[in-house]
Amino acid sequence: ATKKFTIKILKHKKNLGLGRALKTGFEHCFSIGKNDDILISMDTDNSHTVNLSYQMAKKISSNKQDLVIASRYQLTSKTKGLNKLRKILSFGAAILYKIFFPIKNVKDYTSGFRAFRLEKIRNAWKLDKNFFSEKGFSASADILIKLYKVRHKIRFGEMPINLRYDLKKGDSKMKIFK
């Protein structure tokens, strides 16, 4: 049986940053979604492979996990086209996040390619109206940490990703130094 997925493109008139984009998208899904729906966030610059989203959703629909991250730090993960400085900074940030926020089964705190059980993230959002407070690239890690702190028995997991920065459309808007 073939399943159909509904995709709706939501746009801001000007770039408000990753955090605001996530807030707009998630809150739209909260308003129309059912508890057993699966919400997927991903970059649309060609660096993420959409086919992986089916495998991520399968882990959630099989009731094994509530949040699945496409992780750069799984054994079989590959990253192509990312400069060495960004690799070093990303890996360093991952270590720091793991030290200060030791989430079981999570190594990649900043990957934006994720699948969520809608019920779990909606419940966390209802408890904290500032759930989407970060505006920039730190929003991905912030959401993960807030879900960890809520402790609604969220089962975290990861899958390896083949991240293709060499296929990326446009320049990165991430500011390494503010």
Q: Where are the regions that the model predicts?
A:
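Hydrophobic helical membrane-anchoring modules
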Residues: 3-4, 55-58, 103, 127-178
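Acceptor/aglycone-binding surface of glycosyltransferases and processive sugar-polymer synthases
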Residues: 12-31, 50-133, 166-174
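Short beta-strand-to-loop acidic/aromatic patch adjacent to the donor-nucleotide binding site
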Residues: 35-47
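Acidic donor-binding segment of Leloir-type glycosyltransferases
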Residues: 1-10
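The start of beta-strands in P-loop NTPase/AAA+ ATPase cores
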Residues: 6-7, 38-40, 66
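Residue-level signature of catalytic and energy-coupling elements of molecular machines
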Residues: 25, 45, 117, 147, ...
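Short, high-confidence coil segments that cap the C-terminus of an alpha-helix
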Residues: 34-36, 64-66, 152-154
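Conserved residues at the C-terminal ends of beta-strands
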Residues: 42, 71, 162
